[in-house]
Amino acid sequence: MIPRKRYGSKNTDQGVYLGLSKTQVLSPATAISSSSDSTPLPTPVALVPSPPDTMSCRDRTQEFQSACKSLQSRQNGIQTSKPALHAARQCSEFTLMARRIGKDLSNTFAKLEKLTILAKRKSLFDDKAVEIEELTYIIKQDINSLNKQIAQLQDFVRAKGSQSGRHLQTHSNTIVVSLQSKLASMSNDFKSVLEVRTENLKQQRNRREQFSRAPVSALPLAPNNLGGGPIILGAESRASRDVAIDMMDPRTSQQLQLIDEQDSYIQSRADTMQNIESTIVELGSIFQQLAHMVKEQEETIQRIDENVLGAQLDVEAAHSEILKYFQSVTSNRWLMVKIFLILIVFFIIFVVFLA
């Protein structure tokens, strides 16, 4: 048997392992002969199996209970803060609505300024009637929309007034009143601009009629005859009239065309003035609505003023009662004597019995 060479073992002779390999199995006779010939082998060391891995247990009941308590307290905090969140949400909705109305008011003011510049022009040849009519229609629609938005905002304040605080309701009412006043001033400016436009249209019409009206003497008269002599025969008179009518046809057609143009221009200006008058009437209805809303706010302010006056009267009455009580206390000398005697008695008791 050829022994196998192994390295790194202390039981080897010059690095050669003389024993059996792990894959070889000895018979009993061979084991006896080998044990008698060679040195005795060391006794095998029994390998103790390693204990199985055991998971360490730790009581975490307290941690679980503390986590449950913290979660429960967090849920209770959320439930208690729901009214505050609801009030904040309502305040944010009101702020967004008021901001939107303010932005629309500023845009409408810019359009009104442009309309004012165009309406104050008095030139006959630089009259932008189409642009003025478009701006008038747009501003009228914007004013109607703003009026509806402010009414919705006021309804929102009324609906949420009982749920919000007194100071928040007062602040909301103040904002609504300021928006209403801005809309009223803008409507008044729009009405004045329309009145200026109406006056300018009247002046333009008068000037156009003055310059376009031709006197009767300036109109060319049809001649009675071609030769200037008296006409005896009816055929010659008819022929002369035919010739005269043929000669006057171009001028007559031009005058008729000018009359048609004047009629169309006057009709367009009449339509424009009618639109302006209808717009002024609509603005009057908007003013009535704003006056009604301001009247309601005035009643609210009057109630607040009455409450303030009542509180002031109560404070003055309480102040007078306190002054009376103070005068009665200061005038009562026996009370001062009694207090002094009580202090002396307590001092004597303290010195005699406790010292």
Swiss-Prot record:
Keywords: Coiled coil, Golgi apparatus, Membrane, Transmembrane, Transmembrane helix, Transport. Residues 263-325 form the t-SNARE coiled-coil homology domain. The keyword Transmembrane helix applies. It is found in: Endoplasmic reticulum-Golgi intermediate compartment membrane; Golgi apparatus membrane. Residues 1-333 are cytoplasmic. This is Syntaxin-5. Mediates endoplasmic reticulum to Golgi transport. Together with p115/USO1 and GM130/GOLGA2, involved in vesicle tethering and fusion at the cis-Golgi membrane to maintain the stacked and inter-connected structure of the Golgi apparatus. Part of a ternary complex containing STX5A, NSFL1C and VCP. Part of a unique SNARE complex composed of the Golgi SNAREs GOSR1, GOSR2, YKT6 and VTI1A. Component of a SNARE complex consisting of STX5, YKT6, GOSR1 and BET1L. Interacts with BET1L. Interacts with BET1. Interacts with COG4. Interacts with GM130/GOLGA2. Interacts (via IxM motif) with SEC24C and SEC24D; mediates STX5 packaging into COPII-coated vesicles. Interacts with VLDLR; this interaction mediates VLDLR translocation from the endoplasmic reticulum to the plasma membrane. Belongs to the syntaxin family. The gene is Stx5. InterPro entries: SNARE, Syntaxin, Syntaxin-5_N, Syntaxin/epimorphin_CS, T_SNARE_dom. SMART domains: t_SNARE. It is a single-pass type IV membrane protein. Residues 287-318 form a coiled coil. It comes from Mus musculus. The chain crosses the membrane at residues 334-354. GO terms for biological process: early endosome to Golgi transport; Golgi disassembly; intracellular protein transport; positive regulation of protein catabolic process; regulation of Golgi organization; vesicle-mediated transport. It comes from the Eukaryota. Residues 355 are vesicular. Its main location: endoplasmic reticulum. Disulfide bonds: none annotated. A motif (IxM motif) lies at residues 245-247. It holds the Pfam family Syntaxin-5_N.
